[in-house]
């Protein structure tokens, strides 16, 4: 029944197995990939005919984690997997990015790649396993895919690169880098780092590229035995149409791309394209075989050729800048009066409004993952409203792109955050992209640094980010700093680098051609370093370091530690005591199992009141100290006084006054406030108090009477 084909290698100390022919046999390509005891099912299916009018490549990558893979049952009412988590969305994008450029140019049939995590050993991250599975499934499917690709994770510890480090070792690594590529070139890089040099980052990319070559070899060996017949697909030749369009509007497009203002440039480009549509589609002499979809492809090819050729020949960009020149920058901090911290970062026609909000432990985000439930104290949310590019849209919820850009900026600034012990606040950053013409994620990085410094978050150093581009033509190569939207759209690379004056904190690279080599990456990293440092200088004009005080409306947090056996006294039966503290003082109180209590409020008086209350509940009275108390009960032998939180003590009749007392009621009444001194404890641990050695008017000790009492 089954024609099972399998390849196994030892890879970074663990067995890697790719198997096909047993599961999902009706898919065009399907493999089960196992690394250690982590298993992912990868499938690829392509539609045989492209939909009419489609002018893009409809590739969808869906990565999904099944809770049963880690022996868990989903939470919530329905107890089943629901909408994709951020981890699933980010991994889907991670896998999409290196495979998309390797489909034959012009292929527009719908393709769906699905990766399902079936088993997770909590040691080997399934994202790398899924990427290898996607590559193998596509190669076996017969689809016009110019793979295979390989992928690897690279860590960095004690000056050494570590290939595919186990999940539990990543906290000790200075680097978390994922690299994917072909036998000859790198296709994709994604990373976060703890301020590492460009040389270390480049070395990690090349170490990963070398490490996954055996994976590519095993996919090729498997394909030799199990691959399906290649699809009969050849891209259409539109060279004649391109020549016609170039003759019609080539000069118009060239003139349009000399206009610096984005809006005016788009109007001129649109007018040129309308001219081509009218000339070729709205006349009786309409050329054979050309429709609107084809014409769009042809116009884009001509447009790309004109822009790219102009940059290579002249060394000047669309907006007149040189190759390594950064757009003009304006940085502003503290622009919103009631927020905890805010910044407006403008670079050319790209603008990010970033707002920082500080919270307490109650505001931490709970994340339910296959590896277990954990809390995240730092969040960064990126929003790209349609007005930022002068458009309208009905979809206002964050999409895959927004989640991905937010995570990129999150990685970039994470390395400079203070520890939880030094700064016990939850931090949420929100980036609203108010204008966009390229590199909005890197504008978010810059705005995030400024907004946190404005909020008084003691980050170690500011972080800046820059997006690099590439034009790679037979006539030459040009690496571009701080790319525009058009340069991203018509170029060959989107290479984002973020970091401080001390090193790189994040690097992300996407390639639209068949990969780039080490020399191009080296050039791009060096050029990006100069751009980043320039941006940091411009940011410093607004705010060079974190403010010494928190924002006026930010909560203050005070931390104290109590003995663990006193936690029950603070919480009370069913939470009665802690609720009373919160309701009465207005402060938030967070009690940890280890006895650490965090009291927070934007009002200092509320914090003090709550701390005093907690101190009264948990502290022990000190012998020899004077306390103000209240008489709670009068007996024949003395009076009981509540003097220290819930603690009562006895003032014996002989300690009420220096003179002889017939009955305690002659001296004190219930509810009366008195001053008492703690003399000590009797053999049974009972408190001994004295009133007669204290001046009841002033609360001061009477020396002579003290000597007589002792």
Swiss-Prot record:
<feature type="binding site">
    <location>
        <position position="488"/>
    </location>
    <ligand>
        <name>Mg(2+)</name>
    </ligand>
</feature>
<dbReference type="InterPro" id="IPR027408">
    <property type="entry name" value="PNPase/RNase_PH_dom_sf"/>
</dbReference>
<keyword id="KW-0808">Transferase</keyword>
<dbReference type="InterPro" id="IPR012162">
    <property type="entry name" value="PNPase"/>
</dbReference>
<dbReference type="InterPro" id="IPR004088">
    <property type="entry name" value="KH_dom_type_1"/>
</dbReference>
<dbReference type="Pfam" id="PF00575">
    <property type="entry name" value="S1"/>
</dbReference>
<dbReference type="InterPro" id="IPR003029">
    <property type="entry name" value="S1_domain"/>
</dbReference>
<dbReference type="InterPro" id="IPR036612">
    <property type="entry name" value="KH_dom_type_1_sf"/>
</dbReference>
<dbReference type="GO" id="GO:0003723">
    <property type="term" value="F:RNA binding"/>
</dbReference>
<dbReference type="Pfam" id="PF03726">
    <property type="entry name" value="PNPase"/>
</dbReference>
<comment type="function">
    <text>Involved in mRNA degradation. Catalyzes the phosphorolysis of single-stranded polyribonucleotides processively in the 3'- to 5'-direction.</text>
</comment>
<dbReference type="InterPro" id="IPR020568">
    <property type="entry name" value="Ribosomal_Su5_D2-typ_SF"/>
</dbReference>
<dbReference type="GO" id="GO:0004654">
    <property type="term" value="F:polyribonucleotide nucleotidyltransferase activity"/>
</dbReference>
<protein>
    <recommendedName>
        <fullName>Polyribonucleotide nucleotidyltransferase</fullName>
        <ecNumber>2.7.7.8</ecNumber>
    </recommendedName>
</protein>
<keyword id="KW-0460">Magnesium</keyword>
<dbReference type="Pfam" id="PF00013">
    <property type="entry name" value="KH_1"/>
</dbReference>
<keyword id="KW-0548">Nucleotidyltransferase</keyword>
<dbReference type="GO" id="GO:0000287">
    <property type="term" value="F:magnesium ion binding"/>
</dbReference>
<comment type="similarity">
    <text>Belongs to the polyribonucleotide nucleotidyltransferase family.</text>
</comment>
<dbReference type="InterPro" id="IPR015848">
    <property type="entry name" value="PNPase_PH_RNA-bd_bac/org-type"/>
</dbReference>
<dbReference type="InterPro" id="IPR004087">
    <property type="entry name" value="KH_dom"/>
</dbReference>
<dbReference type="GO" id="GO:0005829">
    <property type="term" value="C:cytosol"/>
</dbReference>
<feature type="domain" description="S1 motif">
    <location>
        <begin position="624"/>
        <end position="692"/>
    </location>
</feature>
<feature type="domain" description="KH">
    <location>
        <begin position="555"/>
        <end position="614"/>
    </location>
</feature>
<dbReference type="InterPro" id="IPR012340">
    <property type="entry name" value="NA-bd_OB-fold"/>
</dbReference>
<keyword id="KW-0963">Cytoplasm</keyword>
<dbReference type="InterPro" id="IPR001247">
    <property type="entry name" value="ExoRNase_PH_dom1"/>
</dbReference>
<dbReference type="GO" id="GO:0006402">
    <property type="term" value="P:mRNA catabolic process"/>
</dbReference>
<dbReference type="Pfam" id="PF01138">
    <property type="entry name" value="RNase_PH"/>
</dbReference>
<feature type="binding site">
    <location>
        <position position="494"/>
    </location>
    <ligand>
        <name>Mg(2+)</name>
    </ligand>
</feature>
<keyword id="KW-0694">RNA-binding</keyword>
<dbReference type="InterPro" id="IPR015847">
    <property type="entry name" value="ExoRNase_PH_dom2"/>
</dbReference>
<dbReference type="Pfam" id="PF03725">
    <property type="entry name" value="RNase_PH_C"/>
</dbReference>
<dbReference type="InterPro" id="IPR036345">
    <property type="entry name" value="ExoRNase_PH_dom2_sf"/>
</dbReference>
<keyword id="KW-0479">Metal-binding</keyword>
<dbReference type="GO" id="GO:0006396">
    <property type="term" value="P:RNA processing"/>
</dbReference>
<dbReference type="GO" id="GO:0000175">
    <property type="term" value="F:3'-5'-RNA exonuclease activity"/>
</dbReference>
